[in-house]
C-alpha cells in the first residue's frame, strides 16, 4: 500500500464516520405530488366580468346577514382574480416547485339556467336514487344550455397547467350551488319545503349527476384524477346544525341535516358512475377529517360515536356498501382514492341530555375552537382563525384512514390563516414531517397540496383570513411571495425536508 492509497482509505473512513452522525433529511418519493388547491368562489372573482350568481353569492351580499355579522361584508368580486390571472399564479406555483393542481369547477358558472327540463332516465326505489342515465341526446341538450365561455375558460386554465407538466385533479363541487338549485335566503324565510332547498331536495342528486356527466364529457381529456366534491360533511353540518358559522342556509334543523347527508352520499355515488362512463381516471372524494380525541378516558365511546356519524358513515357506505342497517350495492366500491383536508384536532367529551343519554360535545379551547392568535388549553399557538396548530394529528388521521379502507390518499388541504407569516414555515415543515412518518409506516400517501398558494376569499370570514404562501394585494391584484414560499420551494423541489429545515420539524419553544 503506497502513501496515496493510505491517505484515501483514511479519508474515506473519517468521511463515513462523520456521516454517521449527520442528519441527512427526510426523503420523499420522487413521484410525490406537491401542489395547491383552489375553489372557484374563493379565487376566481376580482376582475371585471368575472362575477357569477350562486347561493353563496347572494348569501354574502345579503344585507340582513351583513348587519347581523353572519358574514363579513367583504365581497367576492373584490377577490384575487384567478379567472383572469391564472397564468400568473401558475408561473408562481411552478417557480416554487409545485407539480400538481387541484382545480375547482363551479356548477353555477356552467349552468346558470336550470337543467331540470332535460329529462333523463332514473332508477329509484325506497332506498334512494340508484342510477341516473345520460345518453348522447342528453349531453347535446346540456351543451346547448351550458355557458360556453365558462367552459372554454376552464379548458384554458387546465390546458395551461397541462402544458407546464402539472398533474391535474379536477374537483366538481366546492359548496356554491346554482341559485335555481338552492336559494338560502328563501329557505331561511319560507323553509326547506317551499324554496329551492339544495341538498335537502333529492332532485339535486339528479341535476348534479347531469352536470358532472357533462363536465367529464367536455373536459375529461385534460384530467388526471377526479374528485366529486369537497368536504360534504361541512355542508350538512354548517348549513343545518352549526348555524352560527355563517354558512348557508343557516337553517337549524336536524332532519334536514340528515337528509342532506344522505343525498350528498348518493350524489357522489351517481357522479362516480357517470364520470366512469367518460373517463378511466381515478375518482375520489375530499373530506375534512380532524384528529378526533377524547378529553378523558371515559369519553372514548363518545369519540367513536362522533367519528361514525361525521366520518365513517360516508366512507363505510362508499367502500363497503354499509348504509345505516343495510347494504347497498349501488354505493359499494364507489371510491378510488381519498382526499384528506387536515387543519387541526377535535377534543370530544360527553354532554348528558337526560339520564344516561349523551351527545358528543366538542370541547372549546382545543382544535378549531380556540381564541385567535393565542394559545390552546394545551399551550399550543393558534392561528388568526383560532385554530390550534397540532401537526401530529395529521399522522393519526392518515394512518387510521389507511388502516380502515386501504385506499390511496392525498393530503388535499393543509394550511394556516397567518397574515404575518409568523407560524406558516413551522406549520408547513412539521405537517410534511408527519406525512413522511405516515409514508414510512406504509400509508399509500401520494401527495401534499397546500391551502393555499395565494390569499383567497375565506367564505363568511371574507378577506381577513390569509392562507397564502403568496400575499395578494386585493386592490392592485399584485402577488408577493411570503418567506414561507421559499421554505415550500426547498421541500418541493428537493422532495425532502433538508437538514437546514430540521429545526422546524418539532413545535417551537413557547
Please describe what each predicted stretch is.
Residues 2-7, 11-12:
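Intrinsic-disorder-associated, low-complexity terminal segments enriched in Asp/Asn/His/Tyr and depleted
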